[in-house]
Design a protein with these regions (language model features):
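Residue-level signal for inorganic ion chemistry
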Residues: 89, 155, 223
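Short, electropositive alpha-helical surface patch
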Residues: 74-75, 99-111, 115, 171-178, ...
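Glycine-rich beta-alpha junction loops
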Residues: 18, 45-47, 95, 125-127, ...
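Conserved N-terminal subdomain of the carbohydrate kinase-like
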Residues: 2-128, 267-282
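Conserved phosphate/ATP/ADP-binding segment of small-molecule kinases
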Residues: 131-208, 215-217, 237-238
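Short, small-residue alpha-helix embedded
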Residues: 161, 216-244
Length: 282
């Protein structure tokens, strides 16, 4: 896909969904729309809000949706012709092994029609030295989804857990760990940087590194939005994809520091700035 023919193209997003807030599909969709891409959101979970959004209210209503819905919905959408303009697949939060396996089945189904369909896997399983999904789910991500992906976007903790190579304190150590995933392009977020800075690495045919100012606390949903921005830039075959996505997210992080959730107005401002930078229509 070239920079001139993304119009009317869509991306299938299989991830979490909330009714209130911008995490999961809600954070990914505006990132894709910045490039004129449609978003077909297929939820793995449905919650009233992210658990951190209203801690005083207790655990949010909702939960995981049946894993069989993933294949059932995808089968129906395919028969309806909804995937005719499909440009890629982006996978995110998976609450169970069954959801991982169903998502892998959908990717295989789609690639039977479009063998070169790009797939980006955000192997969400933990952060800040804490695994927040069962170990068997993290293992299933490595067994079923990463082998089907052309792009993976783990954070530093996820990379270390998935490869059994933590702690990762040097760029070369991180790059070697990323190669163990056997994914053509691995973008590692929250990689080590000099004091007061944080790095993002692209490990593929070459090693690229972008550094930005470290923000002590960033809102939930930032990783989801980053994967969407990188996916959009990748589909445009933009050679500056890593730098553009990283700088956009750094500006957003700076303006949203110490907030628990992504502010909608800041996401829209980031979207507008990105469109202006790339000379994209609003």
């Amino acid at each position: 896909m070239t920079q001139s023919n993304t119009h009317n193209a869509t991306v299938l997003v299989i991830s979490s969904q909330v009714i209130d807030g911008q995490v999961g599909i809600q954070a990914i969709a505006p990132g894709l729309r910045a490039f004129g891409l449609g978003c077909i959101g297929l939820p793995t979970t449905l919650l009233a809000a992210h658990p951190a959004a209203y801690p005083q209210a207790g655990p949010p209503a909702g939960g995981a949706l049946p894993a069989k819905h993933i294949t059932e919905f995808a089968d129906w959408l395919m028969s309806a012709g909804a995937f005719e303009e499909l440009a890629g697949v982006l996978t995110g939060y998976m609450p169970s092994v069954e959801h991982v396996e169903a998502t892998a089945d959908v990717i295989d189904l789609l690639r039977a029609q479009k063998p070169d369909l790009p797939v980006c896997c955000d192997p969400i399983c933990g952060d800040n030295d804490r695994l927040y999904l069962p170990r068997e789910v993290a293992a299933a991500l490595g067994k079923h989804l990463l082998p089907r992906a052309g792009i993976a976007t783990p954070n530093l903790f996820e990379l270390g857990h998935l490869t059994g190579t933590s702690p990762l304190e040097q760029t070369q150590d991180t790059a070697r760990a990323a190669q163990k995933l056997n994914v053509p392009n691995v973008i590692v977020t929250s990689a080590p940087g000099p004091k007061g800075r944080i790095a993002t690495l692209l490990v593929g045919d070459q090693l690229l590194r972008c550094e930005t100012v470290a923000v002590p606390q960033v809102p939930h949903g930032m990783g989801d939005l980053f994967s969407a921005l990188y996916m959009g830039l990748h589909l445009r075959r933009d050679k500056m994809a890593l730098g553009i996505a990283t700088s956009t997210m750094a500006k957003l992080a700076g303006k949203s520091a110490n907030k628990k959730m992504l502010p909608n107005e800041q996401v829209e401002l980031a979207k507008a700035a990105l469109q202006e930078t790339l000379s994209l229509p609003p």
